[in-house]
Amino acid sequence: MITGIQITKSANDDLLNSIWLLDSETNEARCVVAKAGFEEDQVIAAADLGEYESRDVAIEVPAKVEGGQHLNVNVLKKETLEDAVAHPEKYPQLTIRVSGYAVRFNSLTTEQQKDVIARTFTSSL
């Protein structure tokens, strides 16, 4: 796990107020910023920091943008949905995807059901 710290007290003046990322899995420290003695992104053994006092620093990681698309798919025949509108008692468990979430078809109003059918089954794009 990576944690961020700012060194607030150290016998080494170069470490005072420096900011580090500590990796507990590798026991390494990566310098984020230091006034002297260390380079940005320099990696050292965490033990090489010696004795120090520190405060936690919040680490923000920007969201990773991967792109791509999302597709909701209902694998049904138009006739099945139309029959569910006419005879809801025959389809108590019929679940469809609407706007990214699952919903019981029978819980929709008749108007919503007809809208779903119209949007799902089109003659052209």
Swiss-Prot record:
GO terms for cellular component: cytosol. It comes from the Bacteria. PANTHER family: FORMATE ACETYLTRANSFERASE, FORMATE ACETYLTRANSFERASE 1. The modification Glycine radical is found at G100. The gene is grcA. Acts as a radical domain for damaged PFL and possibly other radical proteins. NCBIfam families: spare_glycyl. This is Autonomous glycyl radical cofactor. InterPro entries: Auton_GlycylRad_Cofactor, Form_AcTrfase_GR_CS, Gly_radical, Glycyl_radical_cofactor_GrcA. GO terms for molecular function: formate C-acetyltransferase activity. It comes from Photobacterium profundum (strain SS9). Keywords: Organic radical. Residues 5-125 form the Glycine radical domain. PROSITE patterns: GLY_RADICAL_1, GLY_RADICAL_2.
